[in-house]
Amino acid sequence: MTKTERYLQLRSMIPEMRRIKRIHFVGIGGAGMGGIAEVLVNEGYVVSGSDIAQNAVTDRLCLLGAKIHIGHGADNVQQADVVVVSTAINPENPEIIAAKELRIPIVRRAEMLAELMRYRHGVAIAGTHGKTTTTSLIASLYGQAGRDPTFVIGGLLNSAGTNARLGTSRYLIAEADESDASFLHLQPMVSVVTNIEADHMDTYGGDFEKLKSTFVDFLHNLPFYGVAVVCIDDAVVREIMPRIGRHMITYGFSDDADVQALNFHQQGHQCRFTVRRKGKEDLDLLLNLPGQHNVLNALAAIAVATEDEIDDSAIIQALAEFQGIGRRFQHLGKFATPKGEVMLVDDYGHHPSEVAATIKAARAGWPDKRLVMAYQPHRYTRTRDLYEDFIEVLSQVDCLLLLEVYSAGEAPIPGADGRALCRSIRLRGQLDPIFIASPDQLAEVLPDVLQEGDLLLTQGAGNIGALSRQLAASELGFSTAATTEVKP
């Protein structure tokens, strides 16, 4: 189907959108925004967007035909029929001001995603942790089964080489973002909740009960014939289950889970386990991802696929051949250092529970290796709100290099910066962390810290991901002579 044919088909499905031809994104370089933009480009819309810097997302969109502006300016929105904004964009942005003056409709990212989902069979994945991996696994299972879904993911699906794709079927599989409560715009047929923890609490006025109620509201956006797939291992999810008035399928390691994992064993990068489902034969599975937390993510995907009558053979093959997601326990290689060869793994996790899961997976897969973590805290508010939890989890590694907080646009908060966190961990007495005031200093410190056989884990949601790739490209002073790709 050509772009023109697809455009006309969408017009027949959504006649009310017939006058919308040009869509402009403010902050188009983010994974979530860029993913929706990519789908819209491929549906035949004229897409433009702006961001403060060029990146891989903007480069890909340029190749697809989108017009990208580096920097924000009022002129960028002049021809737009609608403007899409991310929550990271300041209301005083010149493009927002210009759109208001021109009376151009301004919608949030989730509202546009909701329109994409309106006439499709939507599968929306929400939760504090595991959204990207779970969404990627579900998309992979549906793809393996020949369902050819449209998907929008918050990270790079390695097998597809992108985080978004326009499929030919009625399925749309997407992450649902609770950070600003915008996931309440979505009206899917299937909703997944992986877990619920205190995060993005500024959105909820610091009220955890409000956060829990918002997840209940999200599940009640399902039609009465929809399905809620929820992780019964999570204490908060279990707590809210009596309040959910929709058909539920539970998953987890718990004995009372509808989709249960048994006989878990991890070896290196891979996990083996048995899945037990009501009314179905047990399946012995190989998952090409490490850690019990990823088995939970796989169980969610299995539950969704089983409910949609996807064949077991597709489930088995998709999990065994899963190629992972960018920055989710991603092996970047083995590298020679002055004191010997080390293994480099990069991970996006930036909440204490995510960091703990990553550490647990590393310990289980490589128990004999010394674990060296370079951690970059993300947001001052998160560091402040979860300060004691960060002290606890970061004390579990063998060697810690702690970078300054990546602000993500926030103003510094006294006592919630990297230096204060480093001092608090040192006072605990288990570890003597090294504070890295500037990301550029990481290259200077690592050669003295790393030892033969270490597992170096770069962790965080800020620009530490770019630093890890510089390491992998041997741009931080490491020798390239012994560089080899790590195979799972």
From Swiss-Prot:
GO terms for molecular function: ATP binding; UDP-N-acetylmuramate-L-alanine ligase activity. Keywords: ATP-binding, Cell cycle, Cell division, Cell shape, Cell wall biogenesis/degradation, Cytoplasm, Ligase, Nucleotide-binding, Peptidoglycan synthesis. GO terms for biological process: cell division; cell wall organization; peptidoglycan biosynthetic process; regulation of cell shape. It is found in: Cytoplasm. Its main location: cytoplasm. Pathway: Cell wall biogenesis; peptidoglycan biosynthesis. Belongs to the MurCDEF family. One of its GO terms (cellular component) is cytoplasm. InterPro entries: Mur-like_cat_sf, Mur_ligase_C, Mur_ligase_C_dom_sf, Mur_ligase_cen, Mur_ligase_N, MurCDEF_pg_biosynth, UDP-N-AcMur_Ala_ligase_MurC. Its EC number is 6.3.2.8. The lineage of its organism: Bacteria, Pseudomonadati, Pseudomonadota, Gammaproteobacteria, Alteromonadales. The keyword ATP-binding applies. This is UDP-N-acetylmuramate--L-alanine ligase. Cell wall formation. It catalyses: UDP-N-acetyl-alpha-D-muramate + L-alanine + ATP = UDP-N-acetyl-alpha-D-muramoyl-L-alanine + ADP + phosphate + H(+). NCBIfam families: murC.
